[in-house]
């Protein structure tokens, strides 16, 4: 693999399969707010980000440029390429198999990202990679490639916390200033608020993450993993007609989801349950897979809305930013929107290009850290599977 990288990265690159150019102006600071210590760049800065903490392998290139008019920094997404490891229905993804996928695709994904951005490796100011949290062996693939590129081209390295990447990309795209953040994905469920250069965790799952809960139930009822189990649950939930009783596990601002998963799985052994090929319009007292998808979503999402509202009340926030793969779910956005509007606030969310794991969010967070002078020596670039969100010093925010 190292030989492939050396041969490949000494050449010039340019196109990729699916990409749009995004351009954003940073929102001008409110004079009443504390001023960010982040200075405007004196020249265009480029960062390449590599993400591979789970089954998504992503690479993106972002630029931060001074505004020609002297206004806020201009942020441009130059490329955002992703390849997903998809397993057969009923199967999850193992770390070793996922790492094998990443090793097979990493050169191709980076090649597409660099070619699409229309830049050379020598143009980059820093290389950012996901340091954690995530699955160990897939994380190591991204870190190894980042180190190799750094050594080949003498480019500084920045290790990025996966969750902070989600938050910073979400803030950039939506122009949300200081919302409560609901971070919901396959490996994480956290309610977060910013304070004193840390993203503070106010509540989280006590056992499994919401995305893991949905994915595991999708496997039980035989849903496909393409494009993702959670998306397929969302689609089938729209056909549900019956809300079955499930335990409701909120504890303060924390949630417990393992018991709900066990309970909804138990309904598949109920004598009233009819599998996909047995559903008909004749029987009345039946439970269908559609009903279970609907019930699981409604119950778990109600819990997420409740703990988010508690955090909002605690810190006096009006707005919510939903990040992470489950944040793409339109029903979750709708339920959160109802709650936020009742409090006179708003919900911010992104589309699948940015809410699902991607390399551009790592590039964004990495470039923010780089602009504050934060880089990593090679010996500090090991991965951290349990890298807490609140362990990161967010030096670029006031």
UniProtKB/Swiss-Prot annotation:
GO BP field: positive regulation of transcription by RNA polymerase II; telomere maintenance via recombination; tRNA threonylcarbamoyladenosine modification
InterPro entries listed in its UniProt record: ATPase_NBD (IPR043129), Gcp-like_dom (IPR000905), KAE1/TsaD (IPR017861), Kae1_archaea_euk (IPR034680), Peptidase_M22_CS (IPR017860)
E.C. code: 2.3.1.234
A GO CC term assigned to this protein in UniProt: chromatin
Keyword Transferase: yes
GO MF entries: chromatin DNA binding; metal ion binding; N(6)-L-threonylcarbamoyladenine synthase activity; nucleotidase activity
Alphabetized Gene3D superfamilies for the sequence: 3.30.420.40
Keywords: Activator, Acyltransferase, Cytoplasm, Metal-binding, Nucleus, Transcription, Transcription regulation, Transferase, tRNA processing
CDD domains per record: ASKHA_NBD_OSGEP_like_euk
Domain of life: Eukaryota
Cofactor note as given: Binds 1 divalent metal cation per subunit.
Chief place where the protein resides: cytoplasm
Family annotation (NCBIfam families): arch_KAE1, gcp_kae1
Its job: Component of the EKC/KEOPS complex that is required for the formation of a threonylcarbamoyl group on adenosine at position 37 (t(6)A37) in tRNAs that read codons beginning with adenine. The complex is probably involved in the transfer of the threonylcarbamoyl moiety of threonylcarbamoyl-AMP (TC-AMP) to the N6 group of A37. KAE1 likely plays a direct catalytic role in this reaction, but requires other protein(s) of the complex to fulfill this activity. The EKC/KEOPS complex also promotes both telomere uncapping and telomere elongation.
Oligomeric form and interacting partners: Component of the EKC/KEOPS complex composed of at least BUD32, CGI121, GON7, KAE1 and PCC1; the whole complex dimerizes.
Protein's recorded name: tRNA N6-adenosine threonylcarbamoyltransferase
Naturally occurring in which organism (per UniProt): Cryptococcus neoformans var. neoformans serotype D (strain B-3501A) (Filobasidiella neoformans)
Gene that this polypeptide is encoded by: KAE1
